[in-house]
Amino acid sequence: AEMEKEIIKEQKHNNIDAFIICPAPGSDTKDMLKKQCAKTPYTLIMEDVYSKEGGNSGNPVIGPDYYKIGSELGKELGKKRQKIGVVANWKESKSDQDAIRGLKDSLKDTKSEIDWYCYRKKDQNIYEKVSKKDKVDAIVVLDPHALEELGEQSDEDSYQGADIYGIGSSVKAVVLLD
């Protein structure tokens, strides 16, 4: 939130009309936005700010329907019996929670099941963490950065034959998933 705060202060001096902000994870972002943008309208992109109380912050948010994304992944994975591992960015992220809820809901009436979850911590090598997990048939990666990291390593068959499914928007992620 500290970097966002500096950018917001800098842009206020440029007489901007409004902000479009991709919020940093953490509970301090909500308070920072209230203070820094009290007189300037803003819209959040990708996801709402985190609140320890949970729920919606009341801020306008534009972003993908993560529940539907998770649900669609679940429909695909539920077509055959599979043990699934899930890699996500941050346990408290609403987007990750929604995607996991959609995935679980779609898998309810199938023979597929989620065997483990792996959440990234700051500056953590996600490849090392995932490679220590139990063998699964498929790995669902909800963190675009982790998807790129894991995709780069998949050429070496480092996931014991597991197929990788994921959410990503970069050309690199698309190529690695192909």
Predicted regions and their residues:
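Short helix-capping segments at alpha-helix termini
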Residues: 38-39, 105-113, 154-160
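An alpha-beta-alpha
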Residues: 68-116
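Solvent-exposed loop/turn segments at secondary-structure junctions
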Residues: 25-28, 48-52, 90-94, 120-123, ...
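Structural motif
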Residues: 1-15, 115-133, 147-149
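Exported/periplasmic ABC-transporter solute-binding proteins
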Residues: 138, 145-147, 152-178
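Periplasmic-binding protein-like
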Residues: 15-24, 42-45, 85-88, 114-115, ...
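Short beta-strand segments enriched in small/hydrophobic residues
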Residues: 1, 23, 60, 83-92
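Flexible loop/hinge segments that line or gate small-molecule binding clefts
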Residues: 29-68, 168-178
